Each structure stands twice: as structure tokens, then as C-alpha cells.
Swiss-Prot record:
Catalyzes the last two steps in the biosynthesis of 5-methylaminomethyl-2-thiouridine (mnm(5)s(2)U) at the wobble position (U34) in tRNA. Catalyzes the FAD-dependent demodification of cmnm(5)s(2)U34 to nm(5)s(2)U34, followed by the transfer of a methyl group from S-adenosyl-L-methionine to nm(5)s(2)U34, to form mnm(5)s(2)U34. Its cofactor is FAD. Residues 269-672 are annotated as: FAD-dependent cmnm(5)s(2)U34 oxidoreductase. The lineage of its organism: Bacteria, Pseudomonadati, Pseudomonadota, Gammaproteobacteria, Pasteurellales. It comes from Pasteurella multocida (strain Pm70). Keywords: Cytoplasm, FAD, Flavoprotein, Methyltransferase, Multifunctional enzyme, Oxidoreductase, S-adenosyl-L-methionine, Transferase, tRNA processing. This is tRNA 5-methylaminomethyl-2-thiouridine biosynthesis bifunctional protein MnmC. It is found in: Cytoplasm. GO terms for molecular function: flavin adenine dinucleotide binding; oxidoreductase activity, acting on the CH-NH group of donors; tRNA (5-methylaminomethyl-2-thiouridylate)(34)-methyltransferase activity. InterPro entries: FAD-dep_OxRdtase (IPR006076), FAD/NAD-bd_sf (IPR036188), MnmC-like_methylTransf (IPR008471), SAM-dependent_MTases_sf (IPR029063), tRNA_MAMT_biosynth_bifunc_MnmC (IPR023032), tRNA_MNMC2 (IPR047785), tRNA_S-uridine_synth_MnmC_C (IPR017610). The gene is mnmC. Its EC number is 2.1.1.61, 1.5.-.-. In the N-terminal section; belongs to the methyltransferase superfamily. tRNA (mnm(5)s(2)U34)-methyltransferase family. In the C-terminal section; belongs to the DAO family. The keyword Manganese does not apply. GO terms for biological process: methylation; tRNA wobble uridine modification.
């Protein structure tokens, strides 16, 4: 796992932060804010362009986040723009920034003291600051969204990927001076900038170095000099004047935004955790959202448990998936905290999650996690005694502890968040089973079991294990997984439990109902909802076998036969599916010879997709952790916005991945 190294920072006589890595100041000793405004805002003519654009959002990318000064300044300026021109088409600002060496929190706070006018923004950033791993973290600042990419920009910038071709409006070409940081100021940087910049998109920078100017010109930009700030004689600005076709490297995996009109009308099919987070993210973008749920009530299936564990999946041989779950976990915490701040009530406790090395196989798995050397705030290997102290009960083994993990009530969260969203305009229709989708010229026609029809511009499928019930999705390789969660009464000993325990199952601390959740069975290709005495007994046997040498497990008693059955949606590689619904037949026709087309470097068509039809599914048993970030990514895709995921992860989430993998190898894919 690529750890991110914090910056080595000291403060000079003017109290300006100085990087030891680059022996350079983070901003001007004289007036860093005025310099930022002159170089980047005036250099890119932001105020004028914001007034003139007909787009709903504007995208800025920055090389070097530093203290966040440029971000604070442009966020404040954009708020002034929105107040001055409330009826302008432009509603949202996206700020993408790259940082190899983030400041430690203490130094970040000290640097922010120089700019009290940004106190509110600075405090919000400080509260969100973390010990990051490589990749993208998304943060919301009202109408401005910050995508902060930690790690080496040479690795991260290409991960904006095919999707971001021709999408960036303006670049803040910042970072330490070229003479101090030559690794960044390379031709590859300018080439990526050009690839991602819109026609008539711009850049500005404080430097006028000849090598930088020549590199930008060679990449394709029209470059001009203007007066530098303060004592500096000159600085550079430029524009991508020529229209260029998108440079697409993996057309078979290219995702496509929706074709939207103003006040987009979007249908969400499903009433669980994926649906509620999708509704939230879409509503924030101004969509008219209608939710169709076939059950009598919301959260009636896999999202209906009384307690569920919230923590990242850290045990995988593919580091991409670990990165995904760590970023999803960080974003999920933001979303759950947002719900708490809004007064949405749901039982929860950020009590931590203990992972037990209960046998040889699990010990190897936890050893692999320890070898990742994750930040202790995320994961800490602990001895038997230390782990026992964290959970409040003796454990028979060593393990690991995720201090920021939690349990919460999925059922309460989903139902009460939908109630909240309904007060904000989301329309919720229960007992409405959609049985067919038909594409019309400008919309989708949804037909219900009762024979009613509804029209919507965009449809999002978030209906769990019933994802494949439509003609357009019947080829997706997902399957149902039955899970029975036992609800057991607490006891004198069990009531001492103060963290979630995971073994070959899990046990939660007691809820307000004085019960614990003990989970869970896992039966593939089984969608039965009836109570199973055998599974109830097996849930008890698992904990008493895995943690056999401690007495308190004998107080775990499932004989009350209280349980809840949910049907999860999963897929063989256990990775969620997200994005466009692929046109299976057309893709097989277009890509039957994909292996040779690629080998011979022939032109390859973009992946055939069902227009304005999207999905979020196959969340398995990790929906509490993955759904918030997946839903936010989906809403960003629908609205043609930057995505908070690296391309290597996004490709793995693509719903066509199973047959594309085969076709890329030259293997045959069966139809039907």
C-alpha cells in the first residue's frame, strides 16, 4: 500500500510555512492571498468566465494543494459570484488538487492562522483532515466540491483517465519553483494537462521559466507572458485554442454521462442503502427524484437489519480494492456525520471494530493487513490483551482494531433519511414493482406490476438482487446471497461488549432494545426469506467455535429464534457494479474480435450502452461502507462532473467487466 509522507515544514521569520523537502515557501512572504488572486483567478479570468458560461459547473485543477490557500480563495470568490448572480446557469464549482506531501494537522492549523478571513473554511478542512493513503478524497464545501488527490502526481494525474478528457476549464499550475521541484515540472505533466483541458480552457502559473513555457507550447497550449506579481518580472498564462478529439485509451471501459435537460427527472428503483445515498447525491444536484420500491416499506430487504458494521474491507490481494474501501470508508464517515448534523435519527456508535485472528487462515489474512503499514488511526495490530481491552471482554486471540469503525442501524438510517429527503422534494412510491423498462425517444417508460406506466428521463437501478429482472440487465453475472442475522438478548457479560467483534461472523454491542446482532449466514443462489433454525444454530456455533476458550461466548443464545433474513446481491469477484448499463448484445457484436483489434492497434468503438440507464449494485455485505461513495460517483457521472475515483478502480466497477476480461484475452463469451 502506497503510504503518503507528510510534509516536513518549518515557519520562517515572517511566519510563512517553508517546505524542507523543497526548500521553498508555500506562499509569498509579502501577501500570499493577493498573489493567489492575481496569478490564478485573474490569470484564468475566472469572474468573467463564470458570468459567461452556460454550463452548470466549472472545473479547476491545481498542481500542489499546499496549505489550501488557493482553494480557500477561489471557494470564497465563487460564493461571492453565486450571491451576486443567483440566477446564473453556473451553480457548482469542482476543485481538483494534487498533493504529494500533505501538511501535518498542527502545521496546517498554524498556516491557516495567517488568513482569518477563511476561518470557517479552514476549520471545516481541518476537521476532515486525515492520515491519507494514495488516491482521491472528496470533501463538500457547500457549492464547492474538493477532490484532493494524495500521493505522487506522476501516478495520480493519469488516473483522471479517459473520462476526464476535455473536461477541465482552468489550471492553477502551482507547486514549488521549477528549480526546487523539477520532478513535477515535466513534459508529461503538460501533456496530461492538455489532454484533460476543454477547448478554450486555460492555465496560469507564477513562473516564466523558459523550460516550462516551451513544454506547455509543445504540449499544444497557446502561451503568453504577462507582468509577474510583486517583484517578479513575468508569469505565464495560456489557452487550449484548438479543438482536439478525446484521446481514449480503453474505449471498452469508457463511462458516459446522461443526456440531461434542466430539472432532470430521475427514477430510482429500489428502497435500500444504495437508493437512499443515490437519492441524496442526485437531489444535491437539483434533480427531481422519484423512488420506486416494490415492498410495503423502505429498507425491507438487505438494508433492513437492526445493526450493521461499518468498516473498510482491508483483506484483499488486489490493492485497488483496499484503496477503494479505504476511500469509501472516509467518505461514508462524512455522509453519516452529515446525517447526524441534519438531525436524522438512527442508532449508531463509533465504537471501533475488532478483527480476530481466530484460526491460522485469519491470522495470515491479518498479517497481510499489518504488512500494508496503514496509519494507526485506520488499522492497528493488537495483542490478545490489548484487543480484549478495546472490546471490553476477554478474547482468545490477537487481532487488529479499526478505531474509527462503527455499528449503526441500517433500517433506521434508510427509513429516516428517506423521510428527510421527502421533505426536500424526493417522491417516494412504495408497493410499486417495476416489471419492464422500455426506451422511448426522449425518456424511459416504466411499467408496474399493476399495469401503470411512468416516464422518466433517467433511470437508476438500485434494486439489489433483483437487478437482473429487466431485459436490459439479464446478462449481468450477479446472484442472490441469503443472510440470516440472529437477534439475541443481552446478558450481564454480553452487555460489557463495547466494540464490534468480527471472526467468521460478527457480534455487535447491545442496541437500545437490549439485543445484539449475531451474523450471519451466507447462502449463494438462495433468495428464500423464511426463518431457518439450522442457520440460527450455526450463527451461535460459529462464535462459540471461533472464540471457544473464553467463557462469555456461552451466554450467546439464539434459542429465542429471533432473526432477520435479507437477500444480498453479489458477484463472483465480490466487487460492486457501478455506472452505465451495458448493451450486452451490441458489445459482443462490436468486441467479438477485441483481442486482435487491440493487438493490431485498429480503431475500437466506444462501449455500447443503454442511454440514460444506470446501476449501482452487487454491494454484497459491504453496502454500509461502499454505498455513499458509489452513489456520489454515480451522481457525478450522470451530471458529467469529475469523479472521485481513480480510473483503475472505476474500470473494475464497470458492469461489463466479466465479458470484457474474456474478450481482451481472446476467449469466447456465451450468449444466453
Amino acid at each position: 500500500m502506497h503510504k503518503v509522507q507528510f510534509a516536513d515544514v518549518h515557519f520562517n521569520a515572517e511566519n510563512t510555512p517553508v517546505s524542507a523537502q523543497f526548500d521553498d515557501v508555500y506562499f509569498s512572504n509579502q501577501d500570499g492571498l493577493a498573489e493567489s488572486h492575481y496569478i490564478f483567478q485573474e490569470g484564468n479570468q475566472l469572474w468573467q468566465r463564470w458570468q459567461q458560461t452556460s454550463e452548470a459547473h466549472f472545473v479547476i485543477a491545481e498542481t500542489g494543494f499546499g496549505t489550501g490557500l488557493n482553494f480557500f480563495a477561489v471557494t470564497q470568490r465563487f460564493r461571492e459570484f453565486r450571491l451576486t448572480y443567483p440566477d446564473a446557469p453556473l451553480k457548482r464549482l469542482f476543485f481538483i488538487s494534487f498533493e504529494k506531501y500533505p501538511l501535518p494537522l498542527a502545521q496546517l492549523k498554524r498556516a491557516h492562522q495567517a488568513y482569518p478571513e477563511f476561518q470557517s473554511l479552514a476549520q471545516q478542512l481541518q476537521q476532515s483532515w486525515l492520515e491519507p493513503i494514495v488516491g482521491c478524497y472528496r470533501f463538500h464545501f457547500a457549492e464547492t466540491t474538493l477532490d484532493l488527490w494524495f500521493g505522487d502526481m506522476a501516478e495520480n494525474l493519469p488516473q483522471l483517465g479517459d473520462y476526464m478528457c476535455n473536461k477541465i476549464d482552468a489550471w492553477f499550475l502551482d507547486g514549488f519553483a521549477p528549480s526546487k521541484n523539477p520532478q513535477m515540472w515535466q513534459d508529461t505533466l503538460y501533456q496530461h494537462m492538455y489532454r484533460y483541458t476543454k477547448t478554450q480552457g486555460t492555465f496560469s502559473t507564477f513562473t516564466a521559466a523558459s523550460a516550462v513555457r516551451k513544454g506547455l507550447i509543445h504540449a499544444g497550449f497557446t502561451v503568453t507572458k504577462r507582468k509577474g506579481y510583486g517583484k517578479k518580472r513575468e508569469c505565464l498564462q495560456g489557452v487550449k485554442a484548438q479543438q482536439q478529439p478525446a484521446d481514449i485509451h480503453a474505449p471498452w471501459a469508457l463511462v458516459q454521462p446522461a443526456e440531461l435537460t434542466e430539472n432532470a427527472d430521475i427514477a430510482l428503483i429500489g428502497g435500500g442503502i444504495a437508493s437512499v445515498f443515490s437519492a441524496l447525491s442526485l437531489l444535491e444536484r437539483g434533480a427531481k427524484v422519484t423512488v420506486y420500491c416494490e415492498d410495503n416499506s423502505l429498507a425491507a430487504n438487505a438494508s433492513g437489519n437492526k445493526q450493521g458494521a461499518f468498516y473498510p474491507q482491508l483483506s484483499d490481494d488486489d490493492l485497488r480494492y483496499i484503496r477503494f474501501y479505504i476511500h469509501a470508508f472516509a467518505y461514508g464517515k462524512q455522509r453519516f456525520n452529515w446525517a447526524i448534523e441534519q438531525g436524522i435519527t438512527f442508532e449508531h456508535d463509533f465504537c471501533g471494530v475488532a478483527l480476530c485472528a481466530y484460526d491460522a487462515k485469519s491470522a495470515v489474512k491479518l498479517a497481510k493487513i499489518s504488512a500494508l503499514q496503514l496509519p494507526p488511526s485506520l488499522y492497528q495490530p493488537l495483542s490478545q490483551q490489548a484487543l480484549s481491552e478495546q472490546v471490553g471482554l476477554p478474547l482468545p486471540c490477537d487481532g487488529g482494531f479499526i478505531a474509527q469503525g462503527a455499528w449503526l442501524s441500517p433500517q433506521q438510517f434508510v427509513q429516516n433519511t428517506f423521510d428527510f429527503l421527502a421533505t426536500r422534494g424526493v417522491i417516494i412510491k412504495t408497493q410499486q414493482k417495476i416489471t419492464a423498462l422500455e426506451r422511448q425517444t426522449t425518456h424511459w417508460l416504466l411499467t408496474t406490476e399493476q399495469g401503470d406506466s411512468f416516464k422518466h428521463q433517467v433511470v437508476v437501478l438500485a434494486n439489489g438482487h433483483k437487478l437482473t429482472q429487466f431485459r436490459q440487465t439479464e446478462h449481468l453475472p450477479v446472484y442472490p446471497v441469503r443472510g440470516q442475522v440472529s437477534e439475541i438478548a443481552t446478558s450481564t457479560e454480553l452487555s460489557k461488549l463495547k466494540a464490534v467483534i468480527c471472526y467468521d461472523g460478527y457480534l455487535t454491542p447491545k442496541a437500545a432494545s437490549q439485543t445484539h446482532c449475531l451474523g450471519a449466514s451466507h447462502l449463494r443462489d438462495n433468495a428464500e426469506r423464511a426463518f431457518s433454525l439450522q442457520e440460527q444454530q450455526e450463527n451461535q456455533q460459529k462464535i462459540q467455535t471461533n472464540l471457544a476458550s473464553v467463557d462469555w461466548v456461552n451466554e450467546v443464545d439464539t434459542r429465542n429464534n429471533q432473526a432477520r433474513i435479507g437477500i444480498r446481491c453479489s458477484v463472483r469477484d465480490r466487487i460492486p457494479m457501478l455506472g452505465n448499463v451495458p448493451d450486452f448484445e451490441q458489445q459482443l457484436s462490436d468486441y467479438h474480435n477485441l483481442y486482435n483489434l487491440r493487438r493490431r492497434k485498429h480503431a475500437i468503438k466506444h462501449a455500447a450502452l443503454h442511454p440514460n440507464l444506470f446501476l449501482i449494485g452487487a454491494l454484497g455485505s459491504r453496502g454500509l461502507t461502499s454505498a455513499p461513495l458509489l452513489a456520489e460517483t454515480l451522481a457525478s457521472l450522470i451530471y458529467h462532473e469529475p469523479l472521485p475515483l481513480s480510473e483503475d478502480i472505476l474500470h473494475q466497477l464497470n458492469a461489463n467487466r466479466s465479458w470484457i476480461r474474456k474478450l481482451l484475452k481472446g476467449s469466447q463469451v456465451k450468449q444466453g
